[in-house]
């Protein structure tokens, strides 16, 4: 028997399946109409009704540690021979961006510290340009004066790539936040690099489209930073990476040259595809100032299922069944272990809507036919329940319920940040070995680690491995590295699936790339930024 049709007369509905149901029971018998709110939550908004990412400055970091150690005091890094900003420099930059040269120490404190509060620079200057020409003038001046520049968007990165290491000038794109054009037939959006991802999502959704990427940090991250790090996120399974959806870029090179490759064409087979050099380059080759991106049509029907699985083998089999049965409507398949759910409950007060399980999966479908999607989803759920792959679950289709269920996955990073110091690893691994490292590390680290958790994007083989401790520990770091990277290399995996390398991971690039590739990367850097002023100390290994 198929699942009941999902029709508008069911406002804010939630369906649950219980493991106590007998084998062979129909899907209808395994469902019940959910309550208006999940136990453990407040009113209709409460902990669920807000954006998943807590704005900068309002997370619990201040209650954990009032001061973050300066990066050079924690890491063995030496300042390169760049010039120091002088009063004459400040006067010259003030003429370029009048009233937008920030030197106040209080205003400079947040952009000097990363969101995870693990690295801290000592920049004395932040610039806020509004236009590409202002960025060009800034970089031209800094190139002539040999002043290092740290491009910065929403500063939501995980690897220290968006914060200065020493006293680099911070070039913020926060005021470059205008939509330049949108074509409502092709779905091509052209915008400045400082547009916040969530604001762009709202803009295109009002016009019947969606952004091809979605991140837990969408309330703060900038599209320019997303492109500069080739951010993956929650929709890669359906829409692919930004290397496929970004059509064109406008980039300012280190010497102030404006490279305008801001095409809106889906097909352009003329010469080298230069935009690919800057996608994922983390601001080391040029400053992205504008983006042309292809937005897919907004689905008229979205469903989210949150399911409990008895083991990781069942998670993999559920994914295999999901791809086979849901096919063209499958848009996301996320997984998380029980430790993740415990931390979300402990630090954020969010209740798990299903019975406790060793693993949980979140599945999103998106399509244009409510009846068609409901029928396919019903068949899938009946299959995984009857086969024992899934022991319990809940399903939502209205916007509020969907946000509630997604918050359980999207706010894991926030929960981890409240648990102590976090050692974060963003790995690509073969699916059948995706979770093995988590159990391996629990045995290896023992009580020296507070928590070892694993979650991520199963659809594209991306594991987010996180280890927490009360405070930073060199002995714990020594037990983790290089062991994690050697283990990953042994599986022919990648040491960075989507977060990039930034400052904290730059020296492990060799675990994923051969020496010949590293040499070519250095040559490209020297060609486009001969003085090395753009985001120094990032991405490329310190030593050749």
Swiss-Prot record:
- Residues recorded as binding (R)-malate, renumbered to this chain, are 409, 413, 424, 499
Q: Name one GO biological process term.
A: malate metabolic process
- Regulation of protein activity: Activated by zinc and cobalt ions.
The FAD-binding PCMH-type domain covers which part of the protein? 119-298
Q: Which is one Gene Ontology cellular component term of this protein?
A: mitochondrion
Q: Where does Zn(2+) bind?
A: 457, 464, 498
Which EC class heads this enzyme's classification? oxidoreductase
**What does it do?**
Catalyzes the oxidation of D-2-hydroxyglutarate (D-2-HG) to alpha-ketoglutarate. Also catalyzes the oxidation of other D-2-hydroxyacids, such as D-malate (D-MAL) and D-lactate (D-LAC). Exhibits high activities towards D-2-HG and D-MAL but a very weak activity towards D-LAC.
Q: Where does (R)-2-hydroxyglutarate bind?
A: 409, 413, 424, 466, 499
State the superkingdom. Eukaryota
Q: What cofactor does this protein call for? A: FAD
Q: Which Pfam families match?
A: FAD-oxidase_C (PF02913), FAD_binding_4 (PF01565)
Q: Does the keyword Zinc apply?
A: yes
Q: What is its main location?
A: mitochondrion
Write down the EC number: 1.1.99.39
GO terms (molecular function) for this protein are:
(R)-2-hydroxyglutarate dehydrogenase activity; FAD binding; zinc ion binding
The chemistry this enzyme catalyses reads: (R)-2-hydroxyglutarate + A = 2-oxoglutarate + AH2; (R)-malate + A = oxaloacetate + AH2
Location of N6-succinyllysine modifications: 124
Q: What is this protein called?
A: D-2-hydroxyglutarate dehydrogenase, mitochondrial
Transit peptide limits:
1-10
